[in-house]
A protein has these predicted regions:
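Hydrophobic structural segments
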Residues: 1-142
Length: 142
């Protein structure tokens, strides 16, 4: 996503990170950036109705950390498996909550993990699965 000054999100159970964009972005532009970075089949979101600059990210089901993201001064949280009530509550806090899909938000780390394991365990061949892929599809209502 091009975040700078990435750090642990307080209250994020050490699995959610936060950082800032080089410049504030309008929501449509940020959604496009998320789409290009993660390659989801679709994006669900609620609009916090403010420009996006400070962003929290949590791979997989980290929607429950939206309050921590808002308390940490974030404008948006990018994660997956967000519940409807979380969207409502995030919007009430002025936080843009983005559900980019479970697979896309976790799969993005796989190349980094492969390199880490290969470096950590010299001589170990690490192979990414060729069959593990996104299984969720979206039907576009005509």
């Amino acid at each position: 996503l091009g975040l700078e000054d990435v750090e642990r999100l307080s209250g994020g159970d050490d699995i959610v990170r936060q950082g800032r964009l080089p410049a504030a972005m309008a929501l449509p532009d940020f959604l496009e950036r998320v789409g290009k970075a993660l390659g989801p089949n679709g994006i669900r979101y609620t609009d916090g109705e403010r420009p996006i600059r400070r962003v929290a990210v949590g791979g997989g089901a980290c929607g429950s950390f939206f309050r921590a993201a808002a308390a940490g001064g974030c404008d948006a949280l990018v994660t997956a498996d967000v519940k409807y009530d979380q969207f409502l509550d995030a919007r009430a806090l002025g936080l843009t909550l983005i559900d980019a899909g479970h697979f896309p938000t976790e799969n993005v780390i796989c190349p980094v993990l492969v390199r880490f394991l290969e470096e950590r365990f010299c001589g170990l061949e690490v192979v990414r699965s060729a069959v593990h892929r996104e299984v969720v599809r979206y039907f576009a209502v005509p």
